[in-house]
């Protein structure tokens, strides 16, 4: 199990894969235990990635060194409790998101990013305020999200329930995506399977 209780950090990455890179090969990530994160009074521009896969990547589709993601599995329960948090950019919980100008695809060379969530996801956000006016300000919980300028192919399977209890204020550009898939891309979209229930309060 992984338990984190924190206050003021510019970014929090727990039990997942995160990358900001020009060229990078991602590896496998298996979370077999429970993940719990509790924060209060988080600073602005905070970037949360909890039990998930996140990438901000640039590369050339013809370059062998371009980003190549692999697999992420969460078998335990992922719980995130945020109170009085100020989040400037992103909140990702047990999902998959990519801001990428590189190809992420199925082929003999490139494996697709695959996220399997077998445990429950419980997300609580109270009085959280988004401060970034950009369109990348987002909440992604148990699903797929992408801003992609090239070919992309993802698989995401959510086998259990996703529970979200949230109260926040945000800019007009902010959006929330729970247990599904969303893409803003010049090419392919994604594959997403969700066999559990989604509850939003």
Question: What name fits each language-model region?
Answer:
Residues 1-201:
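Surface-exposed loop/turn motifs in large extracellular/passenger domains
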């Amino acid at each position: 199990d992984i338990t984190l209780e924190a206050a003021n950090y510019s970014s929090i990455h727990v039990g997942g894969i995160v990358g900001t890179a020009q060229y990078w090969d991602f590896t496998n990530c298996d979370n077999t235990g429970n993940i719990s994160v509790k924060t209060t009074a988080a600073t602005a521009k905070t970037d949360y990635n909890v039990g998930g896969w996140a990438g901000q990547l640039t590369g050339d589709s013809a370059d062998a060194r371009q980003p190549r993601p692999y697999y992420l599995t969460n078998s335990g329960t992922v719980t995130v409790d945020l109170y009085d948090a100020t989040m400037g950019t992103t909140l990702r919980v047990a999902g998959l998101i990519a801001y990428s100008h590189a190809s992420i695809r199925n082929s003999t060379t490139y494996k697709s990013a695959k996220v399997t969530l077998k445990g429950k996801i419980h997300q609580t956000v109270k009085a959280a305020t988004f401060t970034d006016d950009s369109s990348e300000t987002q909440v992604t919980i148990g699903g797929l999200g992408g801003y992609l300028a090239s070919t992309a192919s993802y698989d995401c399977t959510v086998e259990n329930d996703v529970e979200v209890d949230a109260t926040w204020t945000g800019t007009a550009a902010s959006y929330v995506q729970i247990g599904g898939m969303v893409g803003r891309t010049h090419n392919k979209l994604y594959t997403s399977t969700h066999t559990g229930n989604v509850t939003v309060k």
